[in-house]
């Protein structure tokens, strides 16, 4: 697949981007609009959406595409149903589910609000939008087309590298991102007969408002295990994602460490990226993982001992 770049044509298409008031959602909107792909930005705050649309139009005045927005809290199922009815004439070809938020804390420090927002923002926003969108497509099949005659659509879900390697500090976030990976596998099986392509993205650290917020609550032990981080620019992250989609990959990482960690959890149903090399790396990881895990657990125990003394 790596030599082909014709698997994700966007010119003349319409993309619905959920979680597009900031971060990677905006970066993707810019990339797509630049490629003459009409975009519909979705988020909860209208003023932010209006601001982003104005910036994108000013940045790419040559684009012939349309850009608009829809205000919706997609963690609410009924609002998702309303969303699809509102944008019905557009009938998006591509759906990006980018909404997400991490609040890194020790489990004992999480609040009820933290836990509920983790479920709402990181999981319900995805399953609600995809489910209502698919049901909407089925209800619009007034010509009684056979599943294989449905128009081609793409669904791109955003998980995280922490779904490959969950560790201390991410209990509010990582389990939901693992759920997104599982959901992508099931959707690929259930929606592909209807001409849906389902892709799961596992981004590493990239520059965004969310990344800056994470640093405010991230425990020291989490930072130590994570190691020094040099987040890539958000627009570079978006470029990599679209490039990998174009090459036909349906399991996408945005940096080497993400690809490496993904090798440790190849599984049965997950699509692969440079699969032969992943098998080799997976074998190596299986040998060194117990050693690495011993050091991680040692550091965690020492961290709690230090905290107790203080």
From Swiss-Prot:
Disruption phenotype: Leads to an accumulation of 3-oxosphinganine in cells, and decreases levels of inositolphosphorylceramides. Sensitive to the IPC synthase inhibitor AUR. Abolishes filamentous growth and impairs pseudohyphae formation. Not essential for cell viability. It is a single-pass membrane protein. Pfam families: adh_short. Its EC number is 1.1.1.102. NADP(+) binds at residues 16, 24, 73, 173, 177, 208. It is found in: Endoplasmic reticulum membrane. GO terms for molecular function: 3-dehydrosphinganine reductase activity; NADPH binding. Pathway: Lipid metabolism; sphingolipid metabolism. The chain crosses the membrane at residues 276-296. NADPH binds at residues 19, 21, 23, 44, 48, 73. GO terms for biological process: 3-keto-sphinganine metabolic process; sphingolipid biosynthetic process. GO terms for cellular component: endoplasmic reticulum; endoplasmic reticulum membrane; lipid droplet. SUPFAM superfamilies: NAD(P)-binding Rossmann-fold domains. It catalyses: sphinganine + NADP(+) = 3-oxosphinganine + NADPH + H(+). It comes from the Eukaryota. Keywords: Endoplasmic reticulum, Lipid metabolism, Membrane, NADP, Nucleotide-binding, Oxidoreductase, Sphingolipid metabolism, Transmembrane, Transmembrane helix. A motif (GXSXG) lies at residues 19-23. The active site is at residues 159, 173, 177. InterPro entries: KDSR-like, NAD(P)-bd_dom_sf, SDR_fam. Its main location: endoplasmic reticulum. It is an enzyme of class 1 (oxidoreductase). Catalyzes the reduction of 3'-oxosphinganine (3-ketodihydrosphingosine/KDS) to sphinganine (dihydrosphingosine/DHS), the second step of de novo sphingolipid biosynthesis. Belongs to the short-chain dehydrogenases/reductases (SDR) family. PANTHER family: 3-KETODIHYDROSPHINGOSINE REDUCTASE. This is 3-ketodihydrosphingosine reductase TSC10. It comes from Candida albicans (strain SC5314 / ATCC MYA-2876). The lineage of its organism: Eukaryota, Fungi, Dikarya, Ascomycota, Saccharomycotina.
């Amino acid at each position: 697949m790596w030599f082909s770049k014709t698997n994700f044509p966007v010119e003349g298409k319409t993309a619905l981007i959920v979680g597009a008031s900031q971060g990677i959602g905006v970066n993707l909107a810019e990339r797509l609009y630049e490629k003459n792909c009409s975009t519909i930005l979705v988020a909860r705050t209208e003023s932010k959406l209006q601001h982003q649309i104005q910036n994108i139009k000013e940045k790419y005045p040559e684009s012939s595409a349309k850009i608009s927005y829809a205000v919706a809290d997609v963690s609410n199922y009924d609002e998702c149903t309303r969303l699809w009815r509102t944008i019905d004439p557009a009938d998006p070809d591509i759906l990006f589910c980018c909404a997400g938020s991490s609040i890194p804390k020790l489990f004992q420090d999480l609040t009820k609000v933290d836990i509920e927002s983790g479920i709402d923002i990181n999981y319900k926003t995805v399953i609600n939008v995809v489910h209502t969108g698919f049901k909407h497509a089925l209800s619009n099949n007034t010509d009684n087309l056979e599943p294989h005659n449905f128009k081609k659509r793409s669904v791109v879900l955003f998980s995280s590298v922490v779904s490959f390697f969950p560790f201390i500090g991410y209990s509010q976030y990582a389990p939901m991102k693992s759920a997104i990976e599982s959901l992508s596998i099931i959707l690929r099986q259930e929606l592909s007969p209807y001409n849906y392509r389902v892709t799961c993205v596992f981004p590493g650290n990239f520059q965004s408002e969310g990344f800056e917020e994470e640093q405010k609550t991230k425990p020291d032990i989490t930072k130590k295990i994570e190691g020094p981080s040099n987040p890539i620019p958000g627009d570079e992250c978006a470029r990599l994602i679209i490039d990998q989609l174009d090459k036909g990959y349906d399991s996408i990482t945005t940096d080497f460490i993400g690809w490496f960690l993904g090798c440790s959890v190849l599984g049965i149903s997950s699509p692969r990226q440079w699969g032969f090399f992943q098998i080799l790396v997976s074998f190596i990881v299986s040998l060194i993982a117990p050693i690495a895990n011993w050091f991680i657990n040692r550091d965690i125990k020492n961290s709690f001992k230090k905290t107790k003394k203080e």
